[in-house]
Protein backbone atom coordinates (compact mmCIF):
# COMPACT_ATOMS: atom_id res chain seq x y z
CA UNK A 1 0.00 0.00 0.00
CA UNK A 2 2.94 2.33 0.56
CA UNK A 3 4.30 1.86 -2.97
CA UNK A 4 3.46 4.52 -5.58
CA UNK A 5 0.65 3.58 -7.95
CA UNK A 6 2.84 3.69 -11.10
CA UNK A 7 5.14 1.05 -9.61
CA UNK A 8 2.30 -1.34 -8.76
CA UNK A 9 -0.08 -0.58 -11.62
CA UNK A 10 -0.04 -0.53 -15.39
CA UNK A 11 3.72 -0.49 -16.03
CA UNK A 12 4.74 -3.61 -14.13
CA UNK A 13 5.41 -5.84 -17.17
CA UNK A 14 6.37 -5.70 -20.83
CA UNK A 15 9.11 -4.39 -23.07
CA UNK A 16 11.01 -1.46 -21.51
CA UNK A 17 9.03 -1.68 -18.29
CA UNK A 18 12.31 -1.21 -16.38
CA UNK A 19 12.57 2.28 -17.89
CA UNK A 20 8.91 3.03 -17.27
CA UNK A 21 8.91 1.76 -13.69
CA UNK A 22 11.86 3.95 -12.69
CA UNK A 23 10.35 6.92 -14.51
CA UNK A 24 6.99 6.36 -12.86
CA UNK A 25 8.57 6.22 -9.41
CA UNK A 26 10.51 9.45 -10.04
CA UNK A 27 7.38 11.10 -11.43
CA UNK A 28 5.47 10.11 -8.29
CA UNK A 29 8.12 11.68 -6.06
CA UNK A 30 8.14 14.86 -8.16
CA UNK A 31 4.35 15.02 -8.15
CA UNK A 32 4.21 14.54 -4.37
CA UNK A 33 6.71 17.33 -3.68
CA UNK A 34 5.14 19.77 -6.13
CA UNK A 35 1.59 18.98 -4.99
CA UNK A 36 2.58 19.58 -1.36
CA UNK A 37 4.05 22.97 -2.32
CA UNK A 38 0.97 24.18 -4.19
CA UNK A 39 -1.31 22.90 -1.43
CA UNK A 40 0.63 24.90 1.17
CA UNK A 41 0.30 27.97 -1.06
CA UNK A 42 -3.47 27.58 -1.17
CA UNK A 43 -3.88 26.91 2.55
CA UNK A 44 -1.49 29.61 3.73
CA UNK A 45 -2.00 32.20 1.00
CA UNK A 46 0.43 33.44 -1.68
CA UNK A 47 2.85 35.24 0.64
CA UNK A 48 6.10 36.37 -1.03
CA UNK A 49 8.34 34.76 1.61
CA UNK A 50 6.46 31.46 1.34
CA UNK A 51 6.41 31.57 -2.45
CA UNK A 52 10.16 32.17 -2.59
CA UNK A 53 10.71 29.07 -0.44
CA UNK A 54 8.46 26.80 -2.49
CA UNK A 55 8.42 27.94 -6.10
CA UNK A 56 11.58 26.20 -7.34
CA UNK A 57 10.64 22.97 -5.56
CA UNK A 58 7.26 23.12 -7.29
CA UNK A 59 8.78 23.86 -10.71
CA UNK A 60 11.29 21.03 -10.53
CA UNK A 61 8.78 18.56 -9.08
CA UNK A 62 6.17 19.30 -11.76
CA UNK A 63 8.79 19.06 -14.53
CA UNK A 64 9.99 15.69 -13.23
CA UNK A 65 6.38 14.47 -13.07
CA UNK A 66 5.85 15.51 -16.69
CA UNK A 67 9.06 13.88 -17.95
CA UNK A 68 8.35 10.65 -16.08
CA UNK A 69 4.75 10.63 -17.30
CA UNK A 70 5.87 10.90 -20.92
CA UNK A 71 8.11 7.82 -20.58
CA UNK A 72 5.35 5.87 -18.82
CA UNK A 73 2.93 6.70 -21.64
CA UNK A 74 5.49 5.84 -24.33
CA UNK A 75 6.08 2.42 -22.80
CA UNK A 76 2.40 1.64 -22.25
CA UNK A 77 1.30 2.68 -25.75
CA UNK A 78 3.63 0.09 -27.33
CA UNK A 79 4.29 2.18 -30.46
CA UNK A 80 0.57 2.67 -31.13
CA UNK A 81 -0.81 6.14 -31.80
CA UNK A 82 -1.36 8.11 -28.62
CA UNK A 83 -5.05 8.53 -28.00
CA UNK A 84 -6.04 5.53 -30.12
CA UNK A 85 -7.51 3.78 -27.05
CA UNK A 86 -9.06 4.74 -23.72
CA UNK A 87 -5.86 4.22 -21.75
CA UNK A 88 -4.01 6.47 -24.18
CA UNK A 89 -6.69 9.16 -23.90
CA UNK A 90 -6.42 9.04 -20.11
CA UNK A 91 -2.65 9.38 -20.30
CA UNK A 92 -2.93 12.37 -22.65
CA UNK A 93 -5.26 14.08 -20.17
CA UNK A 94 -2.71 13.46 -17.41
CA UNK A 95 0.16 14.83 -19.50
CA UNK A 96 -1.78 17.91 -20.63
CA UNK A 97 -2.83 18.70 -17.05
CA UNK A 98 0.75 18.26 -15.85
CA UNK A 99 2.09 20.44 -18.68
CA UNK A 100 -0.39 23.20 -17.78
CA UNK A 101 0.77 22.91 -14.18
CA UNK A 102 4.40 23.30 -15.26
CA UNK A 103 3.50 26.49 -17.14
CA UNK A 104 1.56 27.82 -14.14
CA UNK A 105 4.64 27.51 -11.92
CA UNK A 106 6.44 30.06 -14.12
CA UNK A 107 3.66 32.67 -14.02
CA UNK A 108 3.41 35.44 -11.39
CA UNK A 109 1.93 33.93 -8.25
CA UNK A 110 -1.70 34.74 -7.46
CA UNK A 111 -4.30 32.94 -5.40
CA UNK A 112 -6.25 32.06 -8.54
CA UNK A 113 -3.19 30.43 -10.14
CA UNK A 114 -2.52 28.50 -6.94
CA UNK A 115 -6.06 27.13 -7.05
CA UNK A 116 -5.64 26.33 -10.75
CA UNK A 117 -2.51 24.37 -9.85
CA UNK A 118 -4.46 22.41 -7.23
CA UNK A 119 -7.10 21.69 -9.88
CA UNK A 120 -4.46 20.27 -12.23
CA UNK A 121 -3.13 18.09 -9.41
CA UNK A 122 -6.64 16.78 -8.73
CA UNK A 123 -7.15 15.97 -12.42
CA UNK A 124 -3.84 14.11 -12.58
CA UNK A 125 -4.57 12.05 -9.46
CA UNK A 126 -8.17 11.20 -10.40
CA UNK A 127 -7.42 10.26 -14.01
CA UNK A 128 -4.30 8.30 -13.02
CA UNK A 129 -6.31 6.32 -10.49
CA UNK A 130 -9.13 5.68 -12.96
CA UNK A 131 -6.75 4.64 -15.75
CA UNK A 132 -5.48 1.77 -13.62
CA UNK A 133 -8.79 0.07 -14.45
CA UNK A 134 -7.92 0.26 -18.16
CA UNK A 135 -5.64 -2.04 -20.15
CA UNK A 136 -2.57 -0.44 -21.77
CA UNK A 137 -1.87 -1.56 -25.36
CA UNK A 138 1.42 -3.06 -24.14
CA UNK A 139 -0.57 -5.76 -22.31
CA UNK A 140 -2.18 -6.94 -25.55
CA UNK A 141 1.13 -7.78 -27.24
CA UNK A 142 2.48 -11.29 -26.85
CA UNK A 143 5.93 -11.24 -25.26
CA UNK A 144 8.40 -13.75 -23.87
CA UNK A 145 8.58 -14.38 -20.11
CA UNK A 146 11.99 -12.66 -20.02
CA UNK A 147 10.59 -9.47 -21.56
CA UNK A 148 7.61 -9.52 -19.23
CA UNK A 149 9.74 -9.85 -16.12
CA UNK A 150 12.93 -7.98 -17.07
CA UNK A 151 11.75 -5.50 -19.69
CA UNK A 152 14.22 -6.85 -22.27
CA UNK A 153 15.25 -10.10 -23.93
CA UNK A 154 17.88 -12.30 -22.33
CA UNK A 155 21.33 -11.27 -23.59
CA UNK A 156 23.86 -13.82 -24.93
CA UNK A 157 26.21 -15.77 -22.68
CA UNK A 158 28.29 -13.38 -20.59
CA UNK A 159 31.88 -12.59 -21.47
CA UNK A 160 34.29 -10.16 -19.84
CA UNK A 161 33.81 -7.72 -22.71
CA UNK A 162 30.01 -7.85 -22.48
CA UNK A 163 29.98 -7.52 -18.69
CA UNK A 164 32.35 -4.55 -18.55
CA UNK A 165 31.17 -2.71 -21.67
CA UNK A 166 28.24 -0.25 -21.71
CA UNK A 167 24.90 -1.99 -21.48
CA UNK A 168 21.30 -1.21 -20.60
CA UNK A 169 21.24 1.81 -18.24
CA UNK A 170 19.12 2.11 -15.11
CA UNK A 171 17.26 5.44 -15.12
CA UNK A 172 16.67 5.45 -11.37
CA UNK A 173 20.31 5.04 -10.34
CA UNK A 174 21.49 7.42 -13.05
CA UNK A 175 19.14 10.10 -11.75
CA UNK A 176 20.23 9.59 -8.14
CA UNK A 177 23.89 9.73 -9.16
CA UNK A 178 23.55 12.95 -11.15
CA UNK A 179 21.55 14.60 -8.36
CA UNK A 180 24.10 13.45 -5.78
CA UNK A 181 27.10 14.81 -7.68
CA UNK A 182 25.46 18.08 -8.74
CA UNK A 183 24.04 18.75 -5.28
CA UNK A 184 27.41 18.11 -3.63
CA UNK A 185 29.16 20.37 -6.15
CA UNK A 186 26.71 23.21 -5.49
CA UNK A 187 27.18 22.83 -1.73
CA UNK A 188 30.99 22.90 -2.00
CA UNK A 189 30.89 25.93 -4.31
CA UNK A 190 28.62 27.73 -1.85
CA UNK A 191 31.05 26.97 0.96
CA UNK A 192 34.05 28.20 -1.01
CA UNK A 193 32.28 31.43 -1.95
CA UNK A 194 32.06 32.12 1.77
CA UNK A 195 35.82 31.69 2.01
CA UNK A 196 35.65 28.30 3.76
CA UNK A 197 37.66 25.27 2.68
CA UNK A 198 36.43 21.72 2.13
CA UNK A 199 38.46 18.52 2.01
CA UNK A 200 39.45 17.28 -1.42
CA UNK A 201 39.44 13.72 -0.04
CA UNK A 202 35.77 14.10 0.88
CA UNK A 203 34.97 15.37 -2.61
CA UNK A 204 36.85 12.47 -4.19
CA UNK A 205 35.12 9.88 -2.00
CA UNK A 206 31.66 11.27 -2.72
CA UNK A 207 32.14 11.50 -6.48
CA UNK A 208 33.86 8.10 -6.52
CA UNK A 209 30.84 6.48 -4.88
CA UNK A 210 28.45 7.81 -7.51
CA UNK A 211 30.84 6.95 -10.34
CA UNK A 212 30.75 3.34 -9.11
CA UNK A 213 26.95 3.47 -9.07
CA UNK A 214 26.80 4.93 -12.59
CA UNK A 215 29.23 2.32 -13.89
CA UNK A 216 27.42 -0.63 -12.32
CA UNK A 217 24.04 0.68 -13.50
CA UNK A 218 25.22 1.23 -17.08
CA UNK A 219 27.19 -1.87 -18.03
CA UNK A 220 26.44 -5.46 -18.90
CA UNK A 221 26.82 -6.28 -15.20
CA UNK A 222 23.47 -4.61 -14.54
CA UNK A 223 21.68 -6.57 -17.29
CA UNK A 224 23.01 -9.91 -16.07
CA UNK A 225 22.44 -9.06 -12.40
CA UNK A 226 18.70 -9.15 -13.06
CA UNK A 227 18.78 -12.67 -14.49
CA UNK A 228 21.72 -14.53 -12.91
CA UNK A 229 22.18 -14.84 -9.15
CA UNK A 230 25.99 -14.82 -9.17
CA UNK A 231 26.18 -11.48 -11.02
CA UNK A 232 23.31 -10.16 -8.97
CA UNK A 233 25.27 -10.78 -5.77
CA UNK A 234 28.39 -9.13 -7.19
CA UNK A 235 26.47 -5.96 -8.04
CA UNK A 236 24.42 -6.18 -4.85
CA UNK A 237 27.44 -6.48 -2.55
CA UNK A 238 29.31 -3.69 -4.35
CA UNK A 239 26.31 -1.42 -3.88
CA UNK A 240 25.87 -2.42 -0.25
CA UNK A 241 29.50 -2.50 0.92
CA UNK A 242 31.68 -0.20 -1.21
CA UNK A 243 29.30 2.62 -2.16
CA UNK A 244 27.99 3.39 1.38
CA UNK A 245 31.55 3.51 2.75
CA UNK A 246 32.61 6.03 0.10
CA UNK A 247 29.46 8.10 0.66
CA UNK A 248 30.09 8.29 4.40
CA UNK A 249 33.69 9.39 3.78
CA UNK A 250 32.24 12.24 1.73
CA UNK A 251 30.79 13.68 4.98
CA UNK A 252 27.52 14.91 3.41
CA UNK A 253 25.82 15.71 6.74
CA UNK A 254 28.79 17.79 7.90
CA UNK A 255 28.74 19.63 4.58
CA UNK A 256 25.01 20.35 4.89
CA UNK A 257 25.44 21.62 8.45
CA UNK A 258 28.01 24.12 7.22
CA UNK A 259 26.18 25.17 4.04
CA UNK A 260 22.48 25.36 4.94
CA UNK A 261 21.17 28.61 6.36
CA UNK A 262 19.12 28.98 9.52
CA UNK A 263 15.86 30.86 9.85
CA UNK A 264 17.69 33.76 11.52
CA UNK A 265 20.02 34.07 8.54
CA UNK A 266 17.20 33.97 5.99
CA UNK A 267 15.00 36.23 8.16
CA UNK A 268 11.68 35.55 6.42
CA UNK A 269 9.69 34.34 9.41
CA UNK A 270 10.12 30.61 8.78
CA UNK A 271 12.49 27.95 10.04
CA UNK A 272 15.51 27.53 7.79
CA UNK A 273 16.75 24.26 6.26
CA UNK A 274 19.60 24.24 8.81
CA UNK A 275 17.05 24.34 11.63
CA UNK A 276 15.13 21.43 10.11
CA UNK A 277 18.32 19.39 9.65
CA UNK A 278 19.45 19.94 13.23
CA UNK A 279 16.00 19.13 14.60
CA UNK A 280 16.05 15.85 12.67
CA UNK A 281 19.56 14.94 13.86
CA UNK A 282 18.71 15.74 17.48
CA UNK A 283 15.39 13.85 17.37
CA UNK A 284 15.61 10.85 19.71
CA UNK A 285 14.29 8.24 17.22
CA UNK A 286 16.94 9.42 14.75
CA UNK A 287 19.71 8.92 17.30
CA UNK A 288 18.44 5.43 18.06
CA UNK A 289 17.89 4.29 14.46
CA UNK A 290 21.25 5.61 13.24
CA UNK A 291 23.23 4.66 16.32
CA UNK A 292 25.88 1.90 16.31
CA UNK A 293 23.70 -0.67 18.10
CA UNK A 294 20.82 -0.32 15.62
CA UNK A 295 23.29 -0.43 12.73
CA UNK A 296 24.75 -3.67 14.11
CA UNK A 297 21.28 -5.23 14.42
CA UNK A 298 20.37 -4.27 10.86
CA UNK A 299 23.67 -5.62 9.56
CA UNK A 300 23.22 -8.97 11.29
CA UNK A 301 19.58 -9.26 10.26
CA UNK A 302 20.22 -8.35 6.63
CA UNK A 303 22.84 -11.06 6.15
CA UNK A 304 22.66 -13.85 8.72
CA UNK A 305 18.93 -13.90 9.43
CA UNK A 306 18.03 -13.70 5.75
CA UNK A 307 20.64 -16.00 4.19
CA UNK A 308 21.01 -18.55 7.00
CA UNK A 309 17.33 -19.11 7.72
CA UNK A 310 14.35 -20.43 5.70
CA UNK A 311 13.48 -16.79 4.87
CA UNK A 312 15.98 -17.04 2.00
Q: Could you say what each language-model-derived stretch is?
A:
Residues 1-312:
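Alpha-helical membrane segments of multi-pass proteins
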Amino acid sequence: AALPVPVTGAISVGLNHDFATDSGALATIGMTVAAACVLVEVLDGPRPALTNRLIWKQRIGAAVALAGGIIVTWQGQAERSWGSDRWGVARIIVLVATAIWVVITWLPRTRMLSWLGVTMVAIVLIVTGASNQLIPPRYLIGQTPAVNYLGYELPPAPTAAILLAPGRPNIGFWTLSVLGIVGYYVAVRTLKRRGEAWSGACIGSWIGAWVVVIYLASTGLWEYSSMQFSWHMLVHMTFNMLVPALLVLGAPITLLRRVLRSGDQINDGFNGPHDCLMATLEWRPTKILFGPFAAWIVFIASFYVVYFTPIF
